[in-house]
């Protein structure tokens, strides 16, 4: 499966780019570093998982991507609460993250059923 052609990788990459652009000049380096790392981890783990030779390995990395998505959502919610992220933008990002997690779960189930 070519990861560049999957909707999950495309959407995760777009979300990551949006977050990087939003936090480009942010002053709180610790928060900026954490949220951008979480965002980058999602498409990176999707890519790594889909390039693996076994379904078992692919599933492992797709689960890492789901974990990073949950981590990102947590940081988004906190960012909204502390005034670092506009509420409307943040809630859109959180929804996208939820949808990505659901897409990844579908892919994990598909790969798991191939065994």
Can you describe what each PLM-predicted range is?
Residues 1-115:
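Amphipathic alpha-helical assembly/interaction segments
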